[in-house]
Amino acid sequence: MGAQWKVKHKEAAANAKGRTFGKLSKEIMIAARAGADPDMNSRLRLVVEQAKKASMPRETLERAIKKGAGLLGESVNFERLTYEGFAPHRVPVIVECLTDNINRTVSEIRVLFRKGQLGAAGSVSWDFLYQGMIEAVPTAPDADADEAAIEAGAQDCEPGEEGATLFLTEPTDMDAVCKALPQFGFAVQSAQLGYRPKSTVDGLSDEQMAEVEAFLEAIDNHDDVQNVYVGLAG
């Protein structure tokens, strides 16, 4: 895994689609506070690209933008929280949340971490890199990912999912790299800031792996959890 944890099984993944839209809606609403026009709001533009890749219904996307921008007469008050700790078998985990009730979220996340270990700030983040992660697909048969990474200002690139390339950037460079990649034959599908592990835990048995995955799925299923990053090989 070694980065953002994702549901593996088809049935669970199908059930998670609604939760994915809910998480994206929160990100869109927060980004839209700075303006409802994606062309003038780079953060909103990147989240909208993620939403489109996830096949979020247009009506849902547009409502989230309007709500966040205050065009529907509703206030949006979410706070960002980050938790660090360990899943079973000392697998390092970083959990990002967006909540409208900090006390509720803190209490419920602590309960979920009882099968692992909730740590203090910095307890595992020292073993992760905070980076921009851009998924892009080639638009021409001769598009060269390594060359595009250098020319666009990315730190590195590696094969992504379904024929895409994952471009890695400094957090402050992500938007500029997104804008530059089309010049070098790559169309951006999604972009986000997140954590990548410097090292990963491996050698777990099937039974131990099942325990870790059950823990991660329970965390990811929480309504306030946006992203789960894990230092786990495989």
Curated annotation (Swiss-Prot):
Alphabetical UniProt keywords: Cytoplasm, DNA-binding, Transcription, Transcription regulation
Protein location: Cytoplasm
Entries under Gene3D superfamilies matching the protein: 1.10.10.200, 3.30.70.980
Record-linked Pfam families: TACO1_YebC_N (PF20772), Transcrip_reg (PF01709)
GO cellular component: cytoplasm
One example GO MF annotation: DNA binding
GO biological process: regulation of DNA-templated transcription
InterPro entries according to UniProt: Integrase-like_N, TACO1_YebC-like_2nd/3rd_dom, TACO1_YebC_N, Transcrip_reg_TACO1-like, Transcrip_reg_TACO1-like_dom3, YebC-like
Protein known as: Probable transcriptional regulatory protein PSPTO_3162
